Amino acid sequence: MARYEDLPYRTCVGVMLINAKGLVFIGRRAGGIEHIDDTHVWQMPQGGVDPGEDTWAAAKRELYEETSVRSVERLGEVPDWLIYDIPRTVAGRAWKGRYRGQRQKWFAVRFTGKDSEINVENPGGGHKAEFVSWRWEPMKNLPGLIIPFKRPVYERVVKEFSALAEE
């Protein structure tokens, strides 16, 4: 097995889905290897980029696969790739031990549909549910709801997209 320091980062995308009131979609994770406590179980949709896939296409696909949402308008993109490391204690189990963390490209999108379009229990494309529930949350609260090792990424995403938040 490769040393933790030598492992690559998994290439991923993240999506900040913002409603007409400026609130952000967050989903309560269904558990998984990263689950460390019951207070930091919320996150925005995110997932891997397929080989040869454009990051914007990947963002729309991941959003659909996790929320069933297709009614969006692109608002912005964080210019840099944001990186986080997963704790060494779970690195051997997460992603079959192939990655030390993720490098993410983040997009902000306006939700133009109705809340009834959102379905996290039976998401689009027949994919396994990653969330067990969801809610709209003020953007400024997001870093405090995410698992601690992802917090710096969320702080940067909130900073980049803060002008899109509710008044």
UniProtKB/Swiss-Prot annotation:
Residues 8-159 form the Nudix hydrolase domain. Disulfide bonds: none annotated. A motif (Nudix box) lies at residues 47-68. Its EC number is 3.6.1.-. Its cofactor is a divalent metal cation. Accelerates the degradation of transcripts by removing pyrophosphate from the 5'-end of triphosphorylated RNA, leading to a more labile monophosphorylated state that can stimulate subsequent ribonuclease cleavage. This is RNA pyrophosphohydrolase. The gene is rppH.
